[in-house]
Amino acid sequence: MKLYDRPQTLLECRIFVRRLSWLVIDILLAAALTIALLGFSGGVFAQSIKFGYAALNAGQVAPWIAKESGYLSKYGIEADLIYIPAVAATQALIAGEIQLAQVTGVSTAGAILAGADVRIIASVQNKLAGTIYARPEITSPEQLKGKMLGISRFGALSDTAVSIFLQRYGLKRNTDVAVVQMGGLPEIITALERGAIQAGFANPPQTSRAKKLGMRQLFDLNTLGVDLQQTCVTVTTKYLRERRPVVKGFIQAYAEGLHRFITDRDFSIKVMKKYLRIDDKDILDDAYTFYSEKLEKIPYPTLKGIKFIIDEMAEKNPQAKNASPESFVDLSVLQEIEKSGFFTQLWKN
């Protein structure tokens, strides 16, 4: 008896129902497989994640371009990109409110030393970058005695950078110069403009904004050439273990976003304009020029730069004294991607 024959007896009816049931099951299984494949390939059932970035500067651009270019969708990821200032982004990652974060090595190292289950898995900035700007009446670092110097938040990169600056000029933090939190990098320049502080840390595009406001460049930290883990991607080891394919896809999309940033100026400036909410073309041009020359092409973190952070922290944190830089990173995803020839192919042309 064939499935499409009309059953004549009770036995044939039972056989017909059984075969029909198996046919329905086969159809449902095929549909489920199709849905799964759609999700994996970036269709309507793509894996949703929340990604936090910790600063409003052009050094954060790789995930923005990865999203705007469709690279994240290409790897089956639907990402909600959220600005969470400074160390708050690391706190959100630890709490499980976001799945990945782009933060600084400073906030990450502090969290790991405090026992957080977090690792650095990629990086775009491995050198200390930044500038100290002051109000026009301040002509030398020594004139900051008795004044206030703004950072984003304690434990952030700007905090470490300011400490390096003060040490260089023999100024004692909170004795000679009061270091105050402003919340974020744009807020530092706003406070500087209003005279609420006399100096502050800045990175592009805020450096251009400070110049246009007539502020004085007091010290260029970029000239020091310090190896320091700056902008990096972090994840909890739990999420990496449970969602490794998602993390791998994200890093591939991230690397493609980085590639497009370095090779496509016009598109990159459009994306920066959207995320930074800045219309001034000169400011955007300056930011692009600065970061396109500073960001790493292949996003490996710097163990030397992590060691620098650990050594700085060891003065106040005993747990940092015997810490190994290797324990702060998980390079397995990057190594897997590199072994496949992905980076070679990406930068081939």
Question: Predicted regions: what is each one?
Answer:
Residues 241-323:
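Secondary-structure end/capping motifs
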